[in-house]
């Protein structure tokens, strides 16, 4: 039996050729954590969790690696904020204004009048409450499909998720095997389901 050796690294790291060659030679592949590319709930300014614009920019530092050894991270969670607008600096830590939100937790908001506003530069959307005092930054089926198309076209080894249960629908009468809102989009696109 063959055992794989992998690692997960922040997209924010920078490598020179010597270090990249040493790392790539030590592992079968590298999972790049290409999410949490925002201030989340630890910083001071809310923005997109998984902006393609930011991902492309940060991946410039990874060009010293063979793309066929790199998997990019996809997120089925985001961040919820209240009392701030995207890009507005908070008076204190963002944890006082928001929280982590899973895709399953986010979905009921759409049935309660929340609206989507697509950001063409980031290639992902914000969602706003009816009174616009709350918003969520999160991927949706369209942005996930665009990301996996881009990953595949770009010659990367693949993708991975953070995290599996955040969009899971438990088995039921109409869904005997269970399903995933976002993960299944990627699985179908790659011809695995």
PLM ranges: what are they?
Residues 11-23, 138-152:
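Short, acidic/polar
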Residues 155:
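Conserved functional loop/turn residues at catalytic and ligand-binding sites
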